[in-house]
């Protein structure tokens, strides 16, 4: 719920990097380029896998990067844990013949509309994955952006988020409980596309 709370503050940018390289770039951006207050969210446990950014990746305001290319649907995620689950979902869906584009969007309350149009150009099915409440997270950010764009407003967006009081347990148990683990996400995406 911190994204919605801090996102409501004027001139406050919220970032959650997916790996050490992006964390370093985010910190450098906040110190050297930002004209506003910045909040960097960091995972408190080791990353479940190394999230590889494209070789030409540059940390650019409101933009992210395609981590897994796909043509049937798009899943936006952020941070090492949720990016891992998004990539697991892409792997499971590939077994079902579904090609899922996974996009890392570290900017949790800002998006570059021109970049978003390019990323979403070939897909009508857009999904978002938040480690946060469904209110005020990346799902709402992208929903607002899609609705404000004549070329994107016909896209269908489905938000996956923590829809109740967060469960206690190991990360795997909590993700599974909320249906945010990779296998559950794959099943939910497949059901939504049917």
Where are these regions (language model features)?
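Midchain, well-structured core segments that form catalytic/ion-binding scaffolds
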Residues: 20, 40, 45
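Thiamine diphosphate
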Residues: 43-194
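Short, surface-exposed loop/strand segments
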Residues: 37
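Conserved thiamine diphosphate
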Residues: 1-33
């Amino acid at each position: 719920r911190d994204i919605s709370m801090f996102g409501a503050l004027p001139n406050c940018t919220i970032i959650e990097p997916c790996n050490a390289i992006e964390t370093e770039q985010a910190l450098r951006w906040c110190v050297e380029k930002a004209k506003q207050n910045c909040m960097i969210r960091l995972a408190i446990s080791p990353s479940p896998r190394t999230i590889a950014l494209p070789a030409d990746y540059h940390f650019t305001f409101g933009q992210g990067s395609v981590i897994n290319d796909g043509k049937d649907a798009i899943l936006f995620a952020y941070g090492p844990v949720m990016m891992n689950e998004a990539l697991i979902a892409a792997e499971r869906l590939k077994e079902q013949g579904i090609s899922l584009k996974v996009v890392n969007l570290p900017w949790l309350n800002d998006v570059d509309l021109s970049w978003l149009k390019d990323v979403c150009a070939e897909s009508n099915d857009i999904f978002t994955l938040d480690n946060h409440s469904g209110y005020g997270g990346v799902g709402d950010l992208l929903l607002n952006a899609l609705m404000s764009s004549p070329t994107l407003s016909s896209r269908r967006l489905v938000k996956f988020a923590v829809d109740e009081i967060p469960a206690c347990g190991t990360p795997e148990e909590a993700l599974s409980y909320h249906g945010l683990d990779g296998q559950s996400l794959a099943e939910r995406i497949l059901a939504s596309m049917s």
